[in-house]
Amino acid sequence: MPRMVRCSFCGREIEPGTGIMYVKNDGSILWFCSRKCYKNYLLLRRDPRKLKWTLKYGSQTK
């Protein structure tokens, strides 16, 4: 049974068989639900807590 994973950028759940899996050189795996999340995280280096369209918007870890 495939498991649901969460997008590493926006926090939304990704259906099995969809999305982008990115493996870093250190072996950690990043999942992205769309090309939009992929570009914002890896290419533009944006913080998901500062973008209103993400589920992580406004959450501060203290």
UniProtKB/Swiss-Prot annotation:
GO molecular function terms attached to this record: rRNA binding; structural constituent of ribosome; zinc ion binding
Q: Name one Pfam family in it.
A: Ribosomal_L24e
Per UniProt, Zn(2+) binds at C7, C10, C33, C37
PROSITE patterns (alphabetical): RIBOSOMAL_L24E (PS01073)
Q: Tell me the domain of life.
A: Archaea
Q: Does the keyword Amino-acid biosynthesis apply?
A: no
Explain how, and how many, cofactor molecules are bound. Binds 1 zinc ion per subunit.
Q: Which UniProt keywords apply?
A: Metal-binding, Ribonucleoprotein, Ribosomal protein, RNA-binding, rRNA-binding, Zinc, Zinc-finger
Give me any GO biological process, just one: translation
Q: Which SUPFAM superfamilies match?
A: Glucocorticoid receptor-like (DNA-binding domain)
Described purpose of this protein according to its UniProt entry: Binds to the 23S rRNA.
Return the protein name: Large ribosomal subunit protein eL24
User: What gene name is listed for this protein?
Assistant: rpl24e
